[in-house]
Design a protein with these regions (language model features):
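Acyltransferase
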Residues: 161-183, 207-212, 236-257
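Gly/Ser-rich catalytic/binding loops embedded in alpha/beta enzyme cores
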Residues: 1-62
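Short glycine-rich, flexible loops that bind phosphorylated cofactors or substrates
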Residues: 18, 157, 268-270
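Short, surface-exposed loop/helix-turn segments at secondary-structure junctions
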Residues: 194, 238, 265-283
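Small-aliphatic-rich amphipathic alpha-helix that forms the alpha element of a beta-alpha
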Residues: 249-252, 275-296
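Structural helix-boundary/capping segments
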Residues: 5, 9, 50-55, 61-151, ...
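Short helix-loop capping/hinge segments that flank enzyme active sites or metal/cofactor-binding pockets
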Residues: 142-151, 193-247, 251, 296-307
């Protein structure tokens, strides 16, 4: 309704992974039809990459916006948790589900955010946050050259050779702006707690599907629901409590830096349609609820697109998009 009121023309619906989880749809990668477009927002990213639509909407619980954006070579933006209503979207996890936006440029997604960021009584997770001036601030960018932290994380070893070389060249090119930091120790706990919340919520939300249509569900979805039913209330409560404590530790970096950089994915889109790829570089930020964006700045194997992920502080999306726009323009100049 917000988009229609703003004058948008709705082109149609796009394909998503099974119940917005892991089961891949029929969508292929526009750059190479033998490769996955990523997921779960597969069609949303592919539609923008193939010029079927200038903008699109998806969702992210683990890495379902950032990863497809990286694989398809478009901009994918996941705002701070609670800025965009999830009313009408299939619920997989109350605490982890985010709405995400796709476009060709940072200014594209800022335009979409300007319309969609709004408090909604039908989604109690939404907060009052004014989107006034978000497009203007995005265009204006930071007042001075930003400084970044680059987290390689423990997953750096999983990045394919060509992609690792591309990231190392990127870091070298921005050496005056980037400092490489050791991965915070609590990141390992976040991956564990993200899994507990995600699986428990999948079991709660799709338990009826499992009972009635088990044979129609993919093996990964069946396994997630079974695991989710085994997590205790104590484990779930610990996972929720750790969200606040870990974010307080993370937030300290913004006293001296404008953002955190990391790979958007462990490489280019895998040459298979049986998987939507790995979200290992994304789950931390979905858990913390921070704004993050994938910028199509690099190329990996076979000249396939490769995204650089920028992460910001919660409820600082105006400034965050301005910094992202600066980085995009610096790389394109």
């Amino acid at each position: 309704d917000l988009l229609l009121a703003a004058g948008a023309i709705v082109m149609g619906k796009t394909a998503t992974a099974e119940l917005a989880y892991l089961g891949p749809p029929k969508t292929t990668n526009p750059h190479d039809h033998s490769r996955t477009p990523g997921g779960s927002s597969s069609g949303s990213a592919a539609a923008v990459a193939s010029f079927m639509a200038p903008l699109s909407i998806g969702s992210q619980t683990g890495g379902s916006v950032i990863r497809p954006a990286s694989y398809c070579g478009v901009v994918g933006y996941k705002p701070t948790y609670g800025l965009i209503s999830r009313n009408g979207v299939l619920k997989t996890s109350e605490k982890l589900d985010h709405i995400g936006l796709f476009g060709k440029t940072v200014e594209d997604v800022a335009l979409l955010a300007k319309v969609l960021i709004k408090k909604d009584k039908f989604d109690t997770a939404t907060v009052y946050y004014s989107a006034d001036g978000i497009l203007e601030e995005t265009k204006k960018g930071p007042l001075f050259e930003p400084k970044f932290i680059f987290y390689k994380t423990d997953h750096w070893k999983n990045i394919e050779k060509k992609s690792r070389e591309a990231f190392e060249y990127f870091i070298k090119s921005f050496k005056k702006n980037i400092e490489i930091f050791d991965t915070p120790s609590y990141f390992k706990d976040i991956h564990k707690y993200h899994q507990i919340i995600h699986e428990t919520d999948l079991a709660n939300n799709f338990g009826l599907y499992y009972k009635k249509y088990k044979k129609k569900l993919s093996k990964p979805m069946q396994d997630a629901i079974v695991k989710g039913n085994k997590h205790s209330a104590k484990e779930y409560a610990e996972a929720i409590d750790f969200m606040k404590r870990s974010y307080e530790s993370y937030e300290e970096v913004f006293e001296d830096y404008h953002g955190v950089l990391s790979p958007s994915s462990p490489g280019v889109a895998p040459k298979s349609l049986k998987s939507t790829g790995s979200a290992e570089f994304n789950k931390v930020w979905s858990y913390l609820g921070t704004p993050c964006i994938s910028l199509p700045l690099l190329q990996g194997e076979s000249k396939m697109p490769l995204g650089v992920q920028l992460i910001g502080a919660k409820y600082d999306d105006h400034r965050f998009l301005g910094v992202a726009n600066w980085l995009e323009k610096e790389c394109n100049n």
